[in-house]
Amino acid sequence: MPGASAGTSTSESIDAPPEKPLYQMRPVEAGRYIAWAHEHEPDLRKRIAAIARKNIGQPYQLNLLGEFPYQVHDELPMFSLDHSDCTVFVEHTYAMALSTSWDEFFWMLQRIRYRDGIIGVATRNHYTELDWNAANGWLVTDVSAQLAGPDAASYMMTVDRATFLKTRHRTEAAIPVETSRQAYVPKARVVALAGQMQEGDYVNVVSLLADGKTMVTHVGLVVLGPDGERHFLHSSDPAVREETFAAFIARAEAREEGKRLAGKKSSTLLGFKFLRLNDNIVVPPMAPQPRPS
């Protein structure tokens, strides 16, 4: 076939997944692995866990992605296989698990990363609570208040997207300030309640920042350990790891205490928001990409 290159098709079938971790694969290899995973694991929740675990050890790097070359406010690319931060890890895992090919993965990734799938820094889901969670209601549903019941805690969050875009991305956008009250599960109740979560569910870590603001500061996924215990699989410095919720909380508290003893300001872990992976997911189409002005 004219123009075709041998060995570069992402739709070629493979008999077994590559032994190398996902973060060491080239896009062609990743595409074949995505197709293999979809064919050999029909259960979406298990497929999410398998793909996420295929990235254990992936090096952590903050602020990885942008809109380049679609937009040139920076030169950050629109996907990353070799590194991740917490959000990139979750987005790539969900997008791969929902796809059957590299092409579909790339489309799905943009559908998840941007409001209505419209690519642009102003439509990217920057804020976890009011952007990502709200825009991806077709994928996950916040069950934090339901899970915690009378023990639920909450915080007020105010988002000024226009100021954020202007100061961080040199982008002008007329977006009104938004305020919302967010429920979460206090950290003291998380280990007892985590058993109600299911594999593939979405985890938001809620922290009190040194400046007094409360917000989601980290995200990851629920997976099942060998004994059925709920584990937290996430990307954090230095690399993607899997651990129990108790271990994560203990590490966070030890880090906070270390900074306190050193006289340094620190954020404080308050608890977690949990979002249930929806059943019978129907991926909405992207909105038309508007012509740039």
Model segments located where?
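Cationic-aromatic interfacial patches
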Residues: 7-87
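Catalytic-site beta-strand/loop segments enriched in glycine and acidic/polar residues
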Residues: 52, 56-72, 175-216
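Long hydrophobic alpha-helices with heptad-repeat/coiled-coil character
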Residues: 147-150, 156-194, 262-293
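Acidic/His-rich structured neighborhood in mature extracellular/periplasmic domains
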Residues: 60-182, 198, 228, 234
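Charged/polar, solvent-exposed surface patches and flexible loops
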Residues: 32-36, 50-54, 92, 107-111, ...
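Low-complexity, Gly/Ser/Thr/Pro-rich intrinsically disordered linker/tail segments
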Residues: 12, 21, 193-208, 216-217, ...
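Domain-scale selection of a single, long terminal region
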Residues: 2-6
